Amino acid sequence: MKKGILNVLLVFALIAGLSVPSSMQVEAAAPTIKVHFIDVGQGDAIYIKAPSGEDILIDAGNKGKGKTVVNYLKKLKVKDIEIMIASHSDADNVGGLPEVMNNIKVKSLYAPKSTNTTAAYKNFVNTAKKKKLTIKTAKAGVKLPVKGVNAQFVGPVKTYGKTDRNNWSAVLHVAYKKNTFLFTGDAQTKAENDMIKAKKTLRADVLKVSTQGSKAATSKAFVNVVKPKYAIISVGKNGYGHPTSQTVNTLKKAKAKVYRTDRNKTVVVTGNGSSYSIGK
C-alpha cells in the first residue's frame, strides 16, 4: 500500500514539475572513454570512442589488415570517423588506412610531416587526395577538437633524418578527467628523450608501447616519466623477437600490468573518468 502511494505521489510530482528527491532519481550512465587496441598482428590499430561520441582511429595495421579494422568498426556500428591519425609512414601502421578510408567516411586526417615516404605511405596520401581530405600536420602542441577530452600531440617535437621515420611518429596524449593515455606510434629512444627534454605531458596510466616492444624504445628513463599502470603491446608473430624481454622487464619493474595482443587478442580499456576496466 505504501509503495502504491509513493508511486502516485511521484507521478504527481513529475506532472507538476516538482523536483524529485535524489534518492528517487534513476542515475544516468556516466560517459566513458573506450580505447580498443585491435589485434592486427604485427602492427598497430587503435580505435577511440570519446565520451561525447567522436570516433578516432590511429593506424590500421599493414596492407590487408584494413579489412579487419573495417569489420571491427562496423560491428560497433561506427558510421564515420571524426579523426584519423597516421602515426608515421611504416607499412604496419598506415598500410591498412586506405581500405578504411574507402569503406568508412573520414572527416579529418592527421599525419606527421616526415620527409620519408614508403610505398604504403604514398598509397595513403593518394587515397586521401581521392577522398579530398587535407592531411593536417601532427606535431607537438597540436590539439585535437574532441569535446570533454584534452587530446594533444606531444611529439614529434623536432625534425629527424629522412631515414629516421620511427622518431617522426605522432605521439598523442589523451586525458579524460583523471583517465590518461599515451599513444606512442613507433617513437624510439631518441624521440623519447627529446619529449622529456621538451617537458611534454607524458604521464599516463595507459601506455601504448612503441614498436611492438622493441628494445629500441620504451627506455627506463621514459617509463619512469610516464609511470604507466597498464602497458599494451600490439604485436603478432614476427622474426624480430618482439616484444623483447628487456622491454617487458622494464615495464614490470615499473609495476605496469602488461597486455599483449598476440596473447590477449584485442584489448579494450574503458575509463569512467576516475578508474579503468579492461576486457575484450
Go through the PLM ranges and name each one.
Residues 2-280:
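Non-globular, low-confidence helical/coil segments that flank catalytic cores
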